[in-house]
Swiss-Prot record:
PANTHER family listed in its UniProt record: GALECTIN (PTHR11346), GALECTIN-3 (PTHR11346:SF26)
Keyword line: Acetylation, Cytoplasm, Differentiation, Disulfide bond, IgE-binding protein, Immunity, Innate immunity, Lectin, mRNA processing, mRNA splicing, Nucleus, Phosphoprotein, Repeat, Secreted, Spliceosome
Protein name listed in UniProt: Galectin-3
Classification via SUPFAM superfamilies: Concanavalin A-like lectins/glucanases (SSF49899)
Region (Disordered): 1-102
Gene encoding the protein: Lgals3
Positions of region (9 X 9 AA tandem repeats of Y-P-G-X(3)-P-[GS]-[AG]): 35-112
C-alpha cells in the first residue's frame, strides 16, 4: 500500500492543485519557493535590502510580524504536515494572517494546543480506551491528529473509525505478530471482517513518542506517522457522514486527539 508520493498525489481529485491551508507538501517535503522563511532573496533575516537605511529590515523580515509562509511563525490554517516555526506543532491550525515571530511561540487559536509536549501538544494523558466523537461524520479535507507515546513492550495500537457497530477503517499496528512487526488495515460490516491489507513499513517504536495524522479524501484515507506518509486505504463504506466516532485503544499513553478541516 505504501508507495512514492507527492503533493499532487495528496490533492488528486480535489479540483485545486494547491488549495488554501495546504502550504506544505504531504510527508514534510518543502514546498515550492525555496526554504521557508526566505524573507529577502539572499539576505540574512533582518538584513536591509540594497539601498535601505542601515539596520532597517525589509517587510516581513525577522524579527517582527512575518508574512504568509515566512519562517519563523505559525503555519497557515490546518497546514499538514509542512514545516513550522520552532516549537510549533506541525499541522495545527494557526490564525489567519501573521503573528509576531517570537521563537518557539505558538499563537492561541480555536482547537490549538500549547507547545509543551514532544510534538508541541499538551501533556496528557487521556484515558485509553478513548472515544472521540466526530459530529457530522468525516468528510474530505478533514484531518485527524493523534499524539502519544508507545508503552514499553507494547503489543498493538488500534484506531477504529466507527459507524455504529461497523468499523469503516481499522488501523492496527502490531508489534509482535509471529515475531514480525506489521500494520493491518481492514473494514468490518455486519460483524464480518473484510480482506486485510498489510503494511510492512513500521514507524512505531516501543517507549517512543508518535504522531499519527489521518487525512480524509473523497475516496480514501491517507495516514502519515511523524510527518512521513505511510499508507493509503480506499473507502469501503461510502457514506462518510455516518462515520461518527474514532475509537483509540492499545498499549499507548495518549496525549491528545483532535480533528480539523483543512
Amino acid at each position: 500500500m505504501a508507495d512514492g508520493f507527492s503533493l499532487n498525489d495528496a490533492l488528486a481529485g480535489s479540483g485545486n492543485p494547491n488549495p488554501q491551508g495546504w502550504p506544505g507538501a504531504w510527508g514534510n517535503q518543502p514546498g515550492a519557493g525555496g526554504y521557508p522563511g526566505a524573507s529577502y532573496p539572499g539576505a540574512y533575516p533582518g538584513q536591509a535590502p540594497p539601498g535601505g537605511y542601515p539596520g532597517q529590515a525589509p517587510p516581513s523580515a525577522y524579527p517582527g510580524p512575518t508574512g504568509p509562509s515566512a519562517y519563523p511563525g505559525p503555519t497557515a490554517p490546518g497546514a499538514y504536515p509542512g514545516p513550522t516555526a520552532p516549537g510549533a506543532f506541525p499541522g495545527q491550525p494557526g490564525g489567519p494572517g501573521a503573528y509576531p515571530s517570537a521563537p518557539g511561540a505558538y499563537p492561541s487559536a480555536p482547537g490549538a494546543y500549547p507547545a509543551t509536549g514532544p510534538f508541541g501538544a499538551p501533556t496528557g494523558p487521556l484515558t485509553v480506551p478513548y472515544d472521540m466523537p466526530l459530529p457530522g461524520g468525516v468528510m474530505p479535507r478533514m484531518l485527524i491528529t493523534i499524539i502519544g507515546t508507545v508503552k514499553p513492550n507494547a503489543n498493538s495500537i488500534t484506531l477504529n473509525f466507527k459507524k455504529g457497530n461497523d468499523i469503516a477503517f481499522h488501523f492496527n499496528p502490531r508489534f509482535n505478530e509471529n515475531n514480525r512487526r506489521v500494520i493491518v488495515c481492514n473494514t468490518k460490516q455486519d460483524n464480518n471482517w473484510g480482506r486485510e491489507e498489510r503494511q510492512s513499513a513500521f514507524p512505531f517504536e516501543s517507549g517512543k513518542p508518535f504522531k499519527i495524522q489521518v487525512l480524509v479524501e473523497a475516496d480514501h484515507f491517507k495516514v502519515a506517522v511523524n510527518d512521513v506518509h505511510l499508507l493509503q486505504y480506499n473507502h469501503r463504506m461510502k457514506n462518510l457522514r455516518e462515520i461518527s466516532q474514532l475509537g483509540i485503544i492499545g498499549d499507548i499513553t495518549l496525549t491528545s486527539a483532535s480533528h480539523a478541516m483543512i
